[in-house]
A protein has these predicted regions:
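Conserved active-site segment immediately N-terminal to the catalytic lysine
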Residues: 16, 45-79, 108-114, 162
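PLP-dependent aminotransferase class I/II
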Residues: 2-12, 16-20, 25, 29-31, ...
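Conserved phosphate-binding and hydrolysis motifs of nucleotide-dependent enzymes
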Residues: 57, 83, 119
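Glycine-rich, phosphate-binding/catalytic loops in enzymes
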Residues: 34-37, 60-61
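Hydrophobic "anchor" residues on beta-strands that sit immediately upstream
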Residues: 41-42
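Active-site PLP attachment segment
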Residues: 62-101, 124
Length: 248
């Protein structure tokens, strides 16, 4: 109503949508942007896993009003922790910097804060590590694609599962390689996980769905059959590509 979306249960206006480029694979962001424009929704991209991934020639994280990147220790590049926010909105960028610096107001000697905020600034030593990592990003991405290609070839003849490849028209960084069972089967998924770990291969399931976690049990929800099926079907497989650095 009034050109905006509202939650039919609570009546609250829905102001933003947060799409995620899961495992580094770009989602259908252009279609989502069109829907967001129709209903006056702000798009905040979760690009934590997708540095180096593209839709056509456009990098993920540059479609919405802002986006987040992760530089956690397990990501494609790392600063040891933390991340970055991308935006081309100068006013928003200044607001983010202010809140990430304890909302401290300029003053010769007083400590004056004009908002509830936290100290989220990245230490210089971590930023220096990040700059060094960025200089090798192309090498890391190439190695990731070599590994993904080998996985795709290896699973091409599998009958009960398939390798999850980048969507058509996109370039994925293949941050976390994944296989998908052809039919959702929690027992088979767990059997494969146990067998892989027993053989020395560190594999894991996809995350538990948020609406199934105890702290969200009272939150509004809808039926999510696609998410449920994926949870029962996906297995993340070893994704370190260090052995393929320098290969193409």
């Amino acid at each position: 109503r009034d050109g905006a979306l509202h939650n039919t249960t609570t009546g609250r206006r829905i102001s933003a949508v947060v799409p995620m480029h899961t495992f580094g694979h770009p989602m259908q962001i252009e279609a989502l942007i069109d829907v967001a424009k129709e209903f006056n929704l702000v798009v905040v991209e979760d690009a934590a896993e997708s540095i180096g991934s593209y839709v056509g020639s456009t990098h993920t994280g540059t479609f919405g009003r802002c986006s987040s990147l992760s530089f956690n220790g397990n990501k494609t590049i790392t600063t040891g922790g933390g991340g970055a926010i991308l935006t081309n909105d100068a006013e928003l960028a200044q607001r983010i910097r202010h809140l990430a610096t304890t909302a401290k107001m300029p003053h010769d000697y007083e400590y004056i804060h004009d908002a509830v905020a936290f100290n989220y600034r990245m230490p210089n030593i971590n930023a220096a590590l990040g700059c060094a990592q960025l200089s090798r990003l192309d090498d890391f991405l190439s190695a990731k694609r070599v590994l993904a290609r080998k996985y795709a070839e290896g699973f091409s003849s599998a009958r009960s599962m398939q390798f999850v490849a980048e969507p058509h028209g996109t370039t994925s960084n293949y941050w976390l390689n994944t296989i998908r069972l052809n039919k959702p089967d929690l027992s088979l998924r767990d059997e494969l996980l146990v067998a892989a770990r027993a053989s020395g291969y560190m594999c894991r399931p996809a995350w538990n769905l948020l609406h199934t976690l105890p702290m969200h049990e009272s939150a509004p929800r809808a039926k999510l059959p696609v998410a449920q099926n994926l949870w029962q079907s996906l297995i993340n497989i070893p994704s370190s590509a260090r052995h393929y650095l320098g290969q193409k």
